[in-house]
Regions:
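Bacterial N-terminal signal peptides
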Residues: 13-23
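Short, compositionally biased P/S/T/A/G/V-rich stretches that sit at domain boundaries
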Residues: 29-74, 81
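Solvent-exposed loop/turn segments flanking beta-strands in beta-repeat/beta-sandwich domains
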Residues: 83-94
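Aromatic sugar-binding surface patches on proteins
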Residues: 110-119
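Surface-exposed, short loops/turns at beta-strand junctions within beta-sandwich domains
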Residues: 122-129
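Edge beta-strands of extracellular beta-sandwich domains
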Residues: 144-151
């Protein structure tokens, strides 16, 4: 049996844990795509690595649109297009927030990634412009990258 101080301590621990989990969930259970601390990191150095000329998978960004500001929560929808009878290897998709140091968002988005693309109904990010690189590899080992830039407003 717990004494009064142990019960109080345990209750406080549960309240703090619940508050932390609710804070991470964002508005109405939306996935926190980018944290406030991550958004304050310095921008990545410009330039993307260049590969050889191959017909890697196509990457089509549906939302968020780079030419329109978004408000949180917002949808993230990206379609992958395989070529030449190949299939997308969803386990090799990488999603990187382009900051210094780079922030790997892949694990955060794991449930939204499939062979068809990325489909996330509700994401949040702090206000500002964000650049995310998506690397997609097919079962023939061909990789294609695309950078998604979007601006979140209050």
């Amino acid at each position: 049996m717990l004494d009064r101080s142990q019960r109080g301590s345990r209750t406080l621990t549960l309240i703090v844990a619940l508050a932390a989990s609710l804070a991470l969930a964002g508005p109405a259970g939306a996935l926190e795509l980018i944290t406030e601390a991550e958004s304050r990191l310095p921008p990545a150095l410009s330039g993307m690595p260049r590969g050889g000329i191959t017909l890697g998978p196509g990457i089509v960004v549906v939302t968020p649109s780079p030419d329109r500001d978004v408000r949180a929560p917002f949808a993230v929808k990206v379609n992958f297009r395989p070529h030449g009878g190949s299939k997308i290897d969803a386990s090799r998709v990488k999603i990187i927030y382009l900051k210094r140091p780079a922030v790997d968002l892949t694990a955060r988005l794991k449930g939204a990634i499939s062979e068809a693309g990325i489909d996330l109904a509700d994401a949040t990010a702090p206000p500002g412009t964000h650049d995310i690189r998506i690397d997609v590899t097919d079962d023939a080992g061909r990789t294609k990258s695309a950078v998604v830039s979007f601006t979140v407003v209050k």
